[in-house]
A protein has these predicted regions:
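Conserved AMP-binding
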Residues: 86-89, 110, 248, 258-262
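Conserved AMP-binding/adenylation subdomain of ANL enzymes
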Residues: 236-253, 261-274
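Short hydrophobic alpha-helices that are characteristic scaffold elements of the AMP-binding
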Residues: 96-102, 123-124, 262, 271-274
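Conserved AMP-binding/adenylate-forming core of the ANL superfamily
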Residues: 45-97, 114-119, 184-193, 206-207, ...
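Conserved S/T- and glycine-rich ATP-binding loop of Class I adenylate-forming
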Residues: 82, 99, 212, 218-221, ...
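AMP-dependent adenylate-forming
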Residues: 32-56, 178-179
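Structural core segment of the AMP-binding/adenylate-forming
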Residues: 102-191
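Conserved pre-ATP/AMP-binding loop-to-beta segment of ANL
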Residues: 41-44, 164-168, 172-179, 183-217, ...
Length: 274
């Protein structure tokens, strides 16, 4: 006779009544960032211990504004789809909040993707700007991007014309290396100096908390991956309520050891800290 497995039934007493509408905040991610940059300017927000990088809320907010103006300079605006194909590098979050402030949609790309998967996602998402790093493990992201966009090596930066990817106009290398046809991070920040603060403020004022801010693709287990549209309201409150139930306070520190491209990293980890 086969013994029955010793399963223990766990009952979760989830009180829906406690989640009334007054607990859900109607703020954009940009507004959340500016709230903490104003109220706790000198408190640390992000620490990269392996790179000896530390940002307070006010320092990070300034870098986000500079990055946002750089994105505006290359044609990114409300509704533009910006992809990030990178592991947890420092400017991953900078680019997320920069997109959020100007109403662009941040498309997260799995770092395990190979050529066909990358091309499918870029085409399906109508991606306008792709941000990349050198690669992960045995994958060369730079070479794979050139394979996908053969026109890139021979075009002026910001003037990409791809027959297969008509929406794609820019590729940004997240770092200081220079690659043909691509901007690097420093060049984007430099271009932002030509954008007036009033233009940034204008775009910020048009963003609603109910706008889509993040597009995450499903794993594709039962078919082609599908882009899931997530709003500012959705992910900010998701992170807030999760943090509330874990009893997080402003004195706690959260170690994010999961990929930021996944919902666990970008929502449950990052948004908890808001």
């Amino acid at each position: 006779m086969t013994a029955k497995p010793n399963f223990r039934l766990i009952t979760l007493n989830f009180q829906l009544s406690t989640f009334n509408s007054t607990m859900l905040y109607e703020r954009t991610l940009g507004q959340w960032l500016e709230h903490w940059a104003t109220n706790t300017p000198d408190k640390e927000y992000i620490v990269y211990s392996d790179r000896n990088l530390r940002f307070t809320w006010s320092q990070f907010n300034r870098r986000v504004d500079d990055m946002a103006k750089g994105l505006i300079a290359i044609g990114v605006e409300r509704g533009t789809h910006v992809g990030i194909w990178a592991a947890n590098v420092p400017d991953w979050l900078t680019l997320l909040y920069a997109c959020a402030k100007i109403g662009a949609v941040y498309v997260t790309v799995n770092t395990n993707y190979k050529q066909a998967e990358l091309e499918y996602l870029c085409e399906n998402s109508d991606m306008h700007t792709l941000c990349i790093v050198n690669g992960e493990k045995d994958s060369d992201f730079v070479q794979m991007t050139y394979t996908m966009l053969p026109e890139l090596k021979n075009c002026q930066r910001g003037h990409l014309k791809s027959e297969r990817f008509p929406y794609m106009k820019n590729v940004i290398y997240v770092g200081q290396e220079k690659h043909r046809g691509m901007y690097n991070t420093s060049e984007i920040l430099l271009l932002g100096n030509n954008v007036e603060d009033t233009r940034l403020d204008e775009l910020k004022s048009q963003v609603s908390c109910h706008d889509v801010v993040n597009m995450q693709y499903t794993s594709g287990t039962t078919g082609f991956p599908k882009g899931v549209m997530l709003t500012h309201y959705n992910i900010a409150n998701n992170g807030f309520l999760t943090g509330e139930h874990m009893k997080f306070t402003s004195d706690d520190k959260l170690c994010c050891c999961v990929p930021l491209f996944h919902c666990f990293g970008v929502v449950l980890a990052t948004m908890n800290c808001l």
